[in-house]
UniProtKB/Swiss-Prot annotation:
Pfam families for this protein: Ribosomal_L1
GO molecular function terms listed in the Swiss-Prot or TrEMBL record: rRNA binding; structural constituent of ribosome; tRNA binding
Complex formation: Part of the 50S ribosomal subunit.
NCBIfam families: rplA_bact
Family: Belongs to the universal ribosomal protein uL1 family.
Name of the protein described by the UniProt record: Large ribosomal subunit protein uL1
GO-annotated cellular components: cytosolic large ribosomal subunit
GO biological process: regulation of translation; translation
Functional summary from the UniProt entry: Binds directly to 23S rRNA. The L1 stalk is quite mobile in the ribosome, and is involved in E site tRNA release.
InterPro entries: Ribosom_uL1_bac-type (IPR005878), Ribosomal_uL1 (IPR002143), Ribosomal_uL1-like (IPR023674), Ribosomal_uL1/biogenesis (IPR028364), Ribosomal_uL1_3-a/b-sand (IPR016095), Ribosomal_uL1_CS (IPR023673)
Native species: Rhodospirillum centenum (strain ATCC 51521 / SW)
Keywords carried by this UniProt record: Repressor, Ribonucleoprotein, Ribosomal protein, RNA-binding, rRNA-binding, Translation regulation, tRNA-binding
Keyword RNA-binding in annotation: yes
Length: 235
């Protein structure tokens, strides 16, 4: 622990807590501070001016990161017959119907994302109390209830990131690994922030994006210059 404390202390000393960093400088600093013995995840935290307790102020969605997350995602698919074959061909790790539901009810959760064809929702619906709290319940708004299972599996495997605002109005997500190039991380971050911008709810009043910070798994947070970041998104 002393070793970890010394490393973190050194990393903190490289960050100006009163400064709002340009994206490129923030990414460079985060990468240089990611000195753990594993490939740290680069994480973004966005404080939004919303109250998610109100239905018209909820922020939730899915975004495809152009350079993936660097994480191996295990995908389970509820499908039958030809759709099950399509899911397997697309790279799904687990495919099933009632048999898959039985495994989940028995406590088997060896997957990170769950997809279902619409006709399977009668089976999946019964698992709501199990899958819901774990953030695994298929949802048509997120593209995880769909007849296009192959496309959904490829998206999940290729860097699709689900986001949802917490009760405090904060959205967290991993946007890549410290081993990614600076350009790859910047592209992923811009894609994520753009998705949050597009997901601005009708009930949001005043300043929408209040604070954005970037960090690695074991590193200190770095505040981003929001006006410059938003201006860099284009379109």
């Amino acid at each position: 622990m002393a070793k970890l404390g010394k490393r973190l202390k050194k990393a903190v000393s490289t960050v100006d807590r009163d400064k709002f960093y340009a994206l490129d400088e923030a990414v460079k600093t985060v990468r240089s501070n990611a000195t753990a013995k594993f490939d740290e995840t680069v994480e973004i935290a966005m404080n939004l001016g919303i109250d998610p307790r109100h239905a018209d102020q909820m922020v939730r969605g899915m975004v495809q990161l152009p350079n993936g997350t660097g994480k191996t995602v295990r995908v389970a698919v509820f499908a039958r017959a030809g759709k099950a074959d399509e899911a397997l061909a697309a790279g799904a790790d687990i495919v099933g119907a009632e048999d898959l539901a039985d495994k989940i009810q028995a406590g088997e959760f060896n997957f990170d994302r769950c997809i279902a064809t619409p006709d399977m929702m009668g089976v999946v619906g019964r698992l709501g109390k199990i899958l819901g709290p774990r953030g695994l319940m298929p949802n048509p708004k997120l593209g995880t209830v769909t007849p296009n299972v192959a496309e959904a599996v490829k998206a999940a495997k290729g860097g699709a990131v689900e986001f949802r605002a917490e009760k405090t109005g904060i959205v967290h997500a991993g946007v890549g690994k410290a081993s990614f190039s600076e350009q790859a991380l910047e592209e992923n971050i811009r894609a994520f922030v753009s998705a949050i911008n597009r997901a601005k709810p009708s009930g949001a009043k005043g300043t929408y994006i209040e604070k954005v910070s970037l960090s690695s798994t074991m590193g200190p947070g770095i505040k981003l210059d929001i006006p410059a970041l938003v201006a860099s998104l284009g379109g």
